[in-house]
């Protein structure tokens, strides 16, 4: 009877150790997610603050920044973002920019780059609102924008941030 009791104690201890290891792995992954979300939300916040004070930024873009800001803490936004990036691209129809956006890109390329970085940071922050859907959303974004120069440059910078965090 004492051998069975000792075996039961050993099995219980092993199960407790395995459960603690699994919990630790989850907690570490969630802590990494929160660090990344804090980084990208900070980047977005700094960029948005600069853009809000710039009179050259079109009003529709400011409204987009406000919408992104609302989604920063919404885990459902991560799932919705995943759905957007996994939808097949429809029939190619011409993309047209508003005249004020064209003028902005032509006359103020540095501002256009700041806008792109801020929007990218906002999207990245949203992808870190949920551990599981965030990984899927980032993967879908990478597949969708593979090879596009500016997005690739920003993604490399994002990868460097992830590496420096570990």
Question: Residue spans of the language-model regions?
Answer:
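Generic detector of well-ordered alpha-helical segments enriched in charged/polar residues
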Residues: 41, 45, 62-66, 82, ...
């Amino acid at each position: 009877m004492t051998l069975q009791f000792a075996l039961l104690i050993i099995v219980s201890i092993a199960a407790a150790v395995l459960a603690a290891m699994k919990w630790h792995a989850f907690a570490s992954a969630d802590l990494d997610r929160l660090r990344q979300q804090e980084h990208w939300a900070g980047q977005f916040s700094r960029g948005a603050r600069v853009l809000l004070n710039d009179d050259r930024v079109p009003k529709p873009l400011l409204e987009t920044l406000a919408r992104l800001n609302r989604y920063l803490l919404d885990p459902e936004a991560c799932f919705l973002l995943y759905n957007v990036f996994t939808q097949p691209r429809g029939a190619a129809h011409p993309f047209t920019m508003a005249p004020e956006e064209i003028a902005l890109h032509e006359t103020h390329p540095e501002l256009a780059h700041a806008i792109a970085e801020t929007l990218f940071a906002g999207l990245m922050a949203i992808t870190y609102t949920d551990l599981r859907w965030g990984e899927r959303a980032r993967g879908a974004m990478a597949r969708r924008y593979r090879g596009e120069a500016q997005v690739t440059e920003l993604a490399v910078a994002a990868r460097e941030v992830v590496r420096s965090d570990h």
